[in-house]
A protein has these predicted regions:
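N-terminal single-pass transmembrane signal-anchor helix
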Residues: 1-19
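Beta-strand/loop motifs with alternating small/hydrophobic and polar/acidic residues, enriched
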Residues: 13-140
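Broad, structure-driven detector of short, well-ordered beta-strand segments within folded domains
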Residues: 63-67, 78, 165, 236-243
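Intrinsically disordered, low-complexity regions enriched in Pro/Ser/Thr/Gly and acidic residues
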Residues: 81-237, 246-250
């Protein structure tokens, strides 16, 4: 009887260990797939904003996809040529796409940046998206967000400049003003339509301030080194483009 119980206990131990090992392997594989997927989506954000639709499927027995709100105060203030100060843009939250799995699959639980740079203003459109991963309260979480500003400035003539600011966020698939649409977890579709865009243009602009939470970015921070706008003969045109990407997770 003792021998029988010993055999049963050993068999159960082997069974549970094997099940745990298979489960852990599945978790690692699925999370790795979603991690690569988020990286590819982040890399493709410029193409999506130009009208390309992305549709992918992924294994989803253990990993789940969704979204979260990111509280953020983003304000763009402009001083126009007639000394008028206007708030050209204001936004208090962004949406991040998220993936999560209820176990730790990270080598470093402090987390890391998978793609992009953690900056408030970027000068490359490819850096508009940020992907980071971290461990929190029993979950390994990966997030993709576009909560930053892309600035591109061009010199036109001797002392005239044209500044384009692009801001992007995620929205609902059937109603762009809603949060990202989540009705499942096995696939993700992202698309952008030009009529989603909100475009404003201001000229002449004497100064510019971007408030990003506690950070303040001025025109001097955006202008290339050794460049300045002549207060008499120079001019600055600012174009602000706000785009929303429709998301369907199903």
């Amino acid at each position: 009887m003792i021998l029988f119980m010993t055999v049963v206990l050993i068999s159960l131990s082997i069974f549970f260990f094997s099940t745990f090992s298979v489960d852990a392997t599945t978790a690692s594989v699925e999370y790795g797939y979603v991690k690569s997927l988020f990286r590819e989506i982040a890399f493709s954000i410029p193409e999506i904003l130009n009208g390309q639709t992305i549709y992918t499927r992924h294994p989803s027995s253990l990993v789940s996809l969704g979204f979260k709100k990111i509280p953020l105060n983003l304000t763009i203030q402009l001083e126009l040529g007639n000394n008028t100060l206007v708030t050209a843009f204001n936004k208090t939250e962004f949406y991040a796409l998220t993936g999560g799995i209820r176990r730790n699959v990270l080598e470093d639980v402090r987390g890391s940046i998978v793609y992009g740079v953690n900056q408030s203003v970027v000068s490359e459109i490819e850096r508009l998206a940020l992907v980071r991963e971290y461990y929190y309260n029993g979950w390994t979480i990966i997030e993709l967000d576009t909560a930053r500003v892309y600035c591109s400035i061009y010199k036109v003539g001797d002392s005239n400049y044209y500044l384009e600011i692009i801001i992007a966020d995620f929205g609902g698939y059937y109603n762009i003003n809603d949060p990202p649409t989540v009705i499942g977890t096995g696939s993700i579709r992202l698309r952008y339509e030009s009529y989603y865009a909100d475009i404003k243009e201001f000229s002449p602009v004497r100064n510019l301030t971007i408030i990003f939470n506690q950070s303040i970015i001025t025109l001097k921070d955006i202008l290339p080194s050794n460049h300045s706008i002549d207060p008499v003969s120079g001019s600055l045109t600012v174009r602000i483009v706000y785009k929303k990407i429709a998301v369907l997770i199903s």
